[in-house]
Regions:
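Sec-dependent signal peptide recognition
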Residues: 2-8
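C-terminal motif of bacterial Sec signal peptides marking the signal peptidase cleavage site
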Residues: 13-16
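Bacterial signal peptide processing site
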Residues: 18-20
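Short, surface-exposed polybasic-aromatic patches that bind anionic ligands, especially phosphate groups
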Residues: 24-353
Length: 353
């Protein structure tokens, strides 16, 4: 009798272990646990071009002097003297969902649009509407843009959506989209798409693969960002600059840079001597080496964007950007308000085209 009880107990344990193993395998099928930022998938693109020999626009110094002053023209009175530069981690950034349409466990969703920005472009209808691989937990970033990206490892199709809203039946309705068709697993992405532009359309105004110029979670943990960074500018000048494909700036100030216009921090400055906050120093070093560009405007302040933490949080992990999260604690905060805009240098419009 004792042997029978022991056998039953053993079988119950074995069954539980098998069930847990199956759940783990299913979990892996739904959730991509790797990183697009380490190793960086856009190596060899314009995002990893070093800028030490970047030429300067004739009004570069004037732009640098204006950048710290610009937000005060748009901020509410209570923020004018205290807010200059922020970091978006869960709102107004672009979550990236890496999917695998070859995986039998991959979930899908239907996508529809009635917006003229989509329906009159045959390839956008072909590549960004219909049945698209997407995990059920997917959601857009908070804030008004409601954007997210879906990158399919199997096909190499990189889809991005703007103002995506899911109805009660699970169908996503969106206002704008963009795509680029890379090789499977995004092999040679930097070689095949040096400019990091969408083939057609876009989720951000510059119509680029903007999510890959966000600050990656893996990079922040590692302590080094190895690519250029995009930011949302308080306002931009009218027009746009390569590699952007369009812009929506409304500023008439001659020293408001254009969206897409490249900038850097003076390479002759020793950033370690500036007494910047640790996280600001991380960002400043990336901008000094690889540069950056304005990808959108917000009529508020200057805002860098970070990789959205949803893919980690759905696995039960804490938000690394929040107080108590590992990145926040590593840098003793992620405040970027001391970013040295006055030390930036700006390239001529369309530099590198």
């Amino acid at each position: 009798m004792i042997r029978n009880i022991a056998l039953i107990f053993f079988l119950l344990i074995l069954s539980a272990c098998s069930k847990q193993s199956g759940e783990d395998e299913q979990h892996k099928g739904y959730y991509y646990t790797g990183s697009l930022f380490d190793p960086y998938i856009a190596q060899g693109s314009i995002f990893t071009r070093e800028v030490k020999n970047m030429p300067l626009a004739t009004n570069s110094a004037a732009i640098a002097a204006y950048m710290p002053k610009m937000p005060a023209e748009y901020l509410p009175e209570r923020f004018k003297k205290t807010v200059l530069t922020t970091l978006s981690t869960t709102s107004y950034n672009i979550p990236i969902y890496v999917v695998d349409s070859n995986n039998p466990s991959q979930e899908y969703a239907n996508f529809e649009s009635k917006d003229n920005r989509v329906i009159y472009k045959k390839d956008l209808v072909q590549y960004t509407t219909g049945r698209i691989p997407l995990p059920k937990y997917a959601q857009p970033a908070g804030g008004g843009d409601k954007s997210f990206a879906v990158y399919d490892r199997a096909t190499g199709i990189m889809r991005e959506y703007f103002y995506a809203v899911k109805d009660e039946k699970g169908t996503w309705h969106f206002a704008a989209s963009g795509y680029f068709k890379a090789k499977p697993n995004f092999k040679d992405l930097g070689k095949d798409n040096f400019t990091m532009q969408h083939t057609t359309g876009g989720s951000a105004v510059v119509c680029m693969l903007n999510p890959l110029s966000q600050i990656g979670i893996a990079e922040a943990r590692k302590g080094e960002i190895c690519h250029a960074l995009s930011f949302t500018i308080a306002n931009a000048g009218k027009g746009f600059s390569y590699p952007a494909k369009q812009g929506d700036g409304t500023s008439t100030n001659p020293n408001a840079p254009l969206e897409g216009q490249w900038f850097r921090i003076d390479p002759n400055i020793d950033l370690n001597k500036l007494k910047l906050r640790p996280f600001t120093l991380l960002v400043a070093k990336a901008v000094q080496k690889y540069g950056g560009y304005a990808a959108d405007k917000n009529l508020f302040c200057h805002t860098f964007t970070a990789e959205h933490p949803i893919n980690e949080m759905v696995q039960g992990k804490p938000n690394p950007w929040e107080k108590g999260g590992d990145i926040y604690e590593k840098y003793n905060g992620i405040d970027l308000n001391d970013f040295p805009w006055h030390l930036t240098q700006w390239a001529p419009v369309d530099w590198g085209k």
